[in-house]
Amino acid sequence: MKQKTIKQDVSLSGTGLHTGQKGTLTFHPAEANHGIKFRRIDIEGCPVVEAKVENVVDTSRGTTIAQNGVRVYTVEHILASLRGADVDNVLIDLDCEEPPIQDGSARYMLEALKSAGIVEQDAEREYLRVKNTVTYFHPKIGCEIIITPADDFRMEVSVDYKSQVLKPQTAVLKRMSDFEREIAPCRTFVFFQELEMLLKHNLIKGGDLSTAIVFVEDAVQAGELQRVAKLFNMESVGIHQGGILNNTTLHFENEPARHKLLDLIGDMALLGKPILGHVKAFKPGHLANTEFVKLIIENLE
């Protein structure tokens, strides 16, 4: 199979989830074997940051990469959309530190890439393969991620938050061609009890209640709801059927597990090339995902 890039430039604008910065990202076509690179055009010299796991510097609520002190925050949704669009080579201009969150999914980025057109290049695509089954386990959080050798790619992700409103659930991606329909629309999520802590630690400066699903686990007083509404510059918020805040409805019954699968696809793109194998993950997260990627690199054929 040939490598692919986009046919023409395409841009998206919006607000970064964690930094709160408004900005624009622009995807540009790139030559064969270029890979995925970010360019910070708001900084003198327009420094480039390569989307590779050795450049990961932070995994707090998202994956941040950096080179020579230049950071790009929350790259996982962009990387997942590129994998979903089957794009190998692209240069991504950013005029701020963090790409726009859009609705918390990869849907709009994938749509933008497809609107630009996907074209084959005059170079063969190289797929990575593991020699044997690779297992990552994090005993403290109970996370396990496994990849077994195979001639195709598929992924299964399970989550369990010991929650009454977000039940244990599993998502399966049988083939990457299903990503656009089954995974890309699935949004990030958070528990109501985490909101104030995240705001206090400056982790969701650009968040509003349209960029994430908010699950309400415990009984919440009216005063707490009003305080959160004020934090997000809203007149009021409420709890609706299924323990979800602000009248959001799920795209899929297992949307949280599907979003965790989306995140893992994006973090695994930090391998630098697509990989063949069957991946099975229980309770994945950005720290575990990126450590798993490093372990894979140690076990490549």
Regions found by a protein language model. Give the residues of each.
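Short acidic-hydrophobic catalytic motif
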Residues: M1-E301
